[in-house]
Amino acid sequence: MVTIRADEISKIIRERIEQYNTEIKIVNTGTVLQVGDGIARIYGLDEVMAGELVEFEEGTIGIALNLESKNVGVVLMGDGLMIQEGSSVKATGRIAQIPVSEGYLGRVINALAKPIDGRGEISSSESRLIESPAPGIISRRSVYEPLQTGLIAIDSMIPIGRGQRELIIGDRQTGKTAVATDTILNQQGQNVICVYVAVGQKASSVAQVVNTLQERGAMEYTIVVAETADSPATLQYLAPYTGAALAEFFMYRERHTLIIYDDLSKQAQAYRQMSLLLRRPPGREAYPGDVFYLHSRLLERAAKLSSQLGEGSMTALPIVETQSGDVSAYIPTNVISITDGQIFLSADLFNAGIRPAINVGISVSRVGSAAQIKAMKQVAGKLKLELAQFAELEAFAQFASDLDKATQNQLARGQRLRELLKQSQSAPLTVEEQVITIYTGTNGYLDSLEIRQVRKFLVELRAYLKTNKPQFNEIISSTKTFTGEAEALLKEAIQEQMELFLLQEQVEKN
């Protein structure tokens, strides 16, 4: 017969009791009351934070935006077709954040930083909050380095500096995206990381931009964040913040970044849709009262950091679409007041064949010549004034029948200056080439040519200087100044090229 030893049993029981540990896990849960149109109303979730992520039973993630006395309004990051009334929801205790790393360069991702280009996962060991506070006053320094766009009209008269916010505004089909993509192409070799955020665009338009960047080798230093027109409003609203978080990751690592939001009108519309469905009170044009804050907290994240923080920068080029040139609508006026200047693209100029269709008269940069190299300041100083006087004269000349010689000369000069500002798409020019072009125009060397010959002559002159006078480019790039020696070289080249050009034209005529 087996004897039961009490001491052994009590020892085992004692050990088991010591090993037992109570682990209580408290989960903040709620119940779905109503779901539809990308919005869910949740009962419960008493301790949820504003902007906290919540998880539904079937895996959909949402953001708690409306914290009301009886329920919580949640916007869904997906279609939410499988969510049922009465199903449970749990609060995650996290605010929206995305993984960040160098691995994102050259990739196309969505607003949740998931790759959508079919090239596999992106590895990252770090994450950033989608909504981070903007750098404070002490963390910044004033903008002083140029960010060259490669477009003469912008770099000479509406200069953009690293850390600036410059709005690109105009009607649909006036070349807003073209200005932005040309700026990305021009950053090749400039050690600038570019982030292109497409909000509510056609998938075909985004694909076209990505193809252009790939063909020109610009995807190496670019990240594309895309939420197309068929994406849920929540993701269209989040996409710009995702792009900003990625750009900030590089900015705080002492790098220079350029971010393009294409476009903020679509983001505002997505936010309006969400707000109205959440039954927030509508304001002007049915936008909610905090639509200004929507854009200001995004654009304030662009900055030029102080030397203590490593002098990184984030330059923002937001795009806003106007309806038949109405700049006084709600969203355009909001974004104009937040940014440091605007580039206004006009449909009339575009249709008249002036491309890029920049209306120089009402475009401004509030950073101004602080964001230009000395050589550009030296040659471009009188360009804006001459063009403004020409526009005034041209309007007056339509009514005058006989004009004196001086007025005729001024009109002829203005037409040639307007001609030299024209550029083909995806053909950005270096600063040296821009200096050559502007100097030739403002000093009257083009006055003897017919208007149709201007562009051809300038292309040949730039090529001639590159091959026959390489020291000109060296002087400008090393000293950043248009020295007397550089001017002498340029004058020489213009005379030599002009003789060649006129001979060539003569031969072609005969």
From Swiss-Prot:
* Enzyme Commission code: 7.1.2.2
Give the record's membrane topology: Peripheral membrane protein
Subcellular location(s): the record lists:
Plastid, Chloroplast thylakoid membrane
Provide this UniProt record's keywords sorted from A to Z.
ATP synthesis, ATP-binding, CF(1), Chloroplast, Hydrogen ion transport, Ion transport, Membrane, Nucleotide-binding, Plastid, Thylakoid, Translocase, Transport
Q: Which CDD domains match?
A: ATP-synt_F1_alpha_C, ATP-synt_F1_alpha_N, F1-ATPase_alpha_CD
Q: Name one GO cellular component term.
A: proton-transporting ATP synthase complex
Q: Has keyword Zinc-finger?
A: no
Provide the binding site for ATP: G170, D171, R172, Q173, T174, G175, K176, T177
Pfam families to which the protein is assigned, alphabetical: ATP-synt_ab, ATP-synt_ab_C, ATP-synt_ab_N
Broad enzyme group: translocase
Reaction catalysed by this chain?
A: ATP + H2O + 4 H(+)(in) = ADP + phosphate + 5 H(+)(out)
Q: Where is this site: Required for activity?
A: S363
Q: Listed GO molecular functions?
A: ADP binding; ATP binding; proton-transporting ATP synthase activity, rotational mechanism
**InterPro entries registered for this protein in UniProt:** ATP_synth_asu-like_sf (IPR023366), ATP_synth_asu_C (IPR000793), ATP_synth_asu_C_sf (IPR038376), ATP_synth_F1_a_nt-bd_dom (IPR033732), ATP_synth_F1_asu (IPR005294), ATPase_a/bsu_AS (IPR020003), ATPase_F1/V1/A1_a/bsu_N (IPR004100), ATPase_F1/V1/A1_a/bsu_N_sf (IPR036121)
What is the first-listed, main subcellular location in coarse terms?
Answer: plastid
Quaternary form? F-type ATPases have 2 components, CF(1) - the catalytic core - and CF(0) - the membrane proton channel. CF(1) has five subunits: alpha(3), beta(3), gamma(1), delta(1), epsilon(1). CF(0) has four main subunits: a, b, b' and c.
Q: Which family does it belong to?
A: Belongs to the ATPase alpha/beta chains family.
Its function? Produces ATP from ADP in the presence of a proton gradient across the membrane. The alpha chain is a regulatory subunit.
Q: Would you tell me the protein name for this molecule?
A: ATP synthase subunit alpha, chloroplastic
**Native source organism of the sequence:** Lotus japonicus (Lotus corniculatus var. japonicus)
Q: What does the record give as the organism's lineage?
A: Eukaryota, Viridiplantae, Streptophyta, Embryophyta, Tracheophyta
- What is the gene name? atpA
